[in-house]
Amino acid sequence: MSPAPRLNRSRRARAEDYAALSGRVQSPTPSVVHATALALLKGGASALSNAVSNAYVAPGAEVAWDECCAGHLYVRTVSVSPVFGQTAADGNHCSIRYWLATFALGTLRCVEVVDDRGRGPRPYDLTADAQILHQDMADLGMFLTSQTNASDVEWSAQGPEGGCVSGEWTFSVKVNCP
């Protein structure tokens, strides 16, 4: 019996190796949560007025603030919870009606920082940076409220930190059982 394949970045296992590890013959289909995240990413990308160089579904709870000057559009999964149907007389839930998935859809941009001479950013430059972030907010907010079934929609900004700033919408969508 050979050891399991290493799953590091430089030598990820092939799809057939994943299938062998899971006991499946064919590669699995993407989960409904991931498929929803991809659809949100595609819709968000088409809604943005200011282009980004990187668009991705982020793994984990945080988004890496690397190379922010390229501009990033991301979707991350915040949480997924089952919503149950009626409760039976014995106290058991009869069925799961749907899953409530909470996502974050946001952008990561660079902002002006202190220059090599120790001078802070000019007010004009800071205002221009804010204008781009606010346009991202408006574009993505319009997409979420007009083209999705998003609820509990809220925007917040993070940063600036290390020359980067981010703004993201958090919201919930109903999805079929994963």
Question: What does each of the following model-derived ranges do?
Answer:
Residues M1-H93:
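Small/polar-rich, solvent-exposed N-terminal microdomains that initiate assembly or binding
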Residues A13, A19, D115-D129:
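A solvent-exposed, charged loop/short amphipathic helix patch at secondary-structure junctions
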Residues S22-Q26, H34, P121-D125, L144-T145:
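Sequence/structural signature of long amphipathic alpha-helices
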Residues I96-V114, V165-C177:
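Oligomerization/assembly interface segments of phage tail-like spikes and tubes
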